[in-house]
Amino acid sequence: MVKGGREALLGGYEMGRTLGEGNFGKVKYARHLATGGHFAVKILDRGRVVSLRAGDQIRREIATLKLLRHPHVVRLHEVAASKTKIYMVLEFVNGGELFERIAVKGKLSEKEGRRLFQQLIDGVSYCHDRGVYHRDLKPENVLVDQKGNIKISDFGLSALPQHLGNDGLLHTTCGSPNYIAPEVLQNKGYDGSLSDIWSCGVILYVMLIGYLPFDDRNIVVLYQKIFKGDTQIPKWLSHSAQNLLRRILEPNPMKRIDMAGIKSHEWFQKDYIPVLPYDDDDEDVQFGARLPAKEQINDEPGDKNSHQINAFQLIGMASSLDLSGFFEDEEVSQRRIRFTSTHPPKDAFDKIESSATELGFQVQRGHSKLKLMRNCKGSKNPESFMVSAEVFELGPSVNVVELRKSNGDPALYRQLCERISSDMGARNTEQIFATASLEDDLQNSNAGTPLFAL
């Protein structure tokens, strides 16, 4: 913590200097007291969010970051709230923006530009594979860490699969003018993947050449240049770099190179080492927790027993929190359910394993959790369908079972959850996939009862 920069303790975090400010609040440096870890806490003013009608944007950013776990995407670790503020605990990236780096040092060498572009494409491609389109990619939203590696940030304008129209295309104009794809400006449907690729091409141009490919003080003239793809690519760039830029900055999206084409391009392939996403089970993310009072800061999860949930966490998991308006998602129960059970953890794990095995799943036992895997049709990957199972102790006779899908078909996930919850004495499937109130669950805790769906 920087001297003179200490502030009040906040739910287990010691707050420090302000890193930046935006429309809805500020971002502060924070240190986690239990681990000493460094984080960036985005503090949003709920009144400001409501007055600017930005609830959907904030909700979208949270919902998006919950899905993404990749070395080149900024990680969301925790979300909490008070009556007046929303707190997003994010990965701390201490190298600043790519924009600042280029503004200060100028254009990058082809070798360095290629390395960063490979990381950018790895991160963006990972997002696309999960149905997430950024829609506002620019150097200001690409951070650089202390080791010189990039992290994609600011997913407030991103789109998820449920935002697609009946034609399978996106229809909302988003993004920054200089980086926006021509098809997005036409107010017609557009492919989110191809529009993101265009923005990546503009970023590559800026990295290698040092200025924008499309720029003009007059916004109409700027848009005309973008529509025409009217830009000059210097001859001093290597032939293969020129070729890739032209293929990305193709104004006709039907002719534009796609993600697979970029990854197989000779310029991109040089010294390319693909980066693997994080294991989805590496670390869980906590959502919906009410901001602890100052005297509660030592009551942190995992201090004494990684299997136990304290009363504060239990309240945070319930659906009756003020946060519901920000964190509810119609698709969320298709990825994770939790229900209460009276079975001891060992017996619960045995029952889960038995139910999953009978349905043809492979079961791997790890520390305090099970991994349930099944090969789906058309895939040779044994992890093409994967669900993790955990059991948390609420008390001597009440536990919480969590089933969380990492990959795979929602219908198969629903079938698996129905079987396991039924075998453990829970209520019917429709109730399992609905969010129940905390009070009802505690009153019915003698049987397996759904507690919440995150």
Swiss-Prot record:
Keyword Nucleotide-binding in annotation: yes
Cofactor: Mn(2+)
Sequence ranges assigned to domain NAF in this UniProt record: 304-328
Enzyme Commission code(s) on record: 2.7.11.1
Region (PPI) location: 334-363
Pfam families to which the protein is assigned, alphabetical: NAF, Pkinase
UniProt GO molecular function: ATP binding; protein serine kinase activity; protein serine/threonine kinase activity
Keywords: ATP-binding, Kinase, Manganese, Nucleotide-binding, Serine/threonine-protein kinase, Transferase
Catalytic activity: L-seryl-[protein] + ATP = O-phospho-L-seryl-[protein] + ADP + H(+); L-threonyl-[protein] + ATP = O-phospho-L-threonyl-[protein] + ADP + H(+)
Domain called Protein kinase: residue spans: 13-268
Expression induction or repression: By drought and salt stresses and abscisic acid (ABA).
Active site: D136
The name this protein goes by in its record: CBL-interacting protein kinase 17
